[in-house]
Amino acid sequence: MKEGIHPKNHKVIFQDVNSGYRFLSTSTKTSNETAEWEDGNTYPVIKVEVSSDTHPFYTGRQKFNEKGGRVEQFKKRYNMGK
């Protein structure tokens, strides 16, 4: 690999703006806003709109499409289904 062309990877705090949930991870993204983590160190804070704390797939509050597929909709529309 070439030297000096790869972005630096460092620890950052991701914060969900909807719930306030925070988690520590690594990223190439950085921020001017910083916060202290549970380990006593200060890390940049990246604000996200959706995280595993608020995403419907992870919370179990997802909606399923109850309309059926295209064939079922066609049959229903033209009274072809029995």
Swiss-Prot record:
Pfam families: Ribosomal_L31 (PF01197). One of its GO terms (cellular component) is ribonucleoprotein complex. It comes from the Bacteria. While neither of the L31 paralogs is essential, this protein does not seem to function as the main L31 protein. Has a higher affinity for 70S ribosomes than the zinc-containing L31 paralog; is able to displace it to varying extents, even under zinc-replete conditions. Part of the 50S ribosomal subunit after the end of exponential growth. Induction: Only found in ribosomes after the end of exponential growth. In PubMed:12904577 its expression was predicted to be repressed by the zinc-specific metallo-regulatory protein zur; in PubMed:15049826 it was shown that its expression is indeed repressed by zur. InterPro entries: Ribosomal_bL28/bL31-like_sf, Ribosomal_bL31, Ribosomal_bL31_B, Ribosomal_bL31_sf. Keywords: Ribonucleoprotein, Ribosomal protein. This is Large ribosomal subunit protein bL31B. GO terms for biological process: translation. Belongs to the bacterial ribosomal protein bL31 family. Type B subfamily. PANTHER family: 50S RIBOSOMAL PROTEIN L31, CHLOROPLASTIC, LARGE RIBOSOMAL SUBUNIT PROTEIN BL31C. Disulfide bonds: none annotated. GO terms for molecular function: structural constituent of ribosome. NCBIfam families: L31, PRK01678.1.
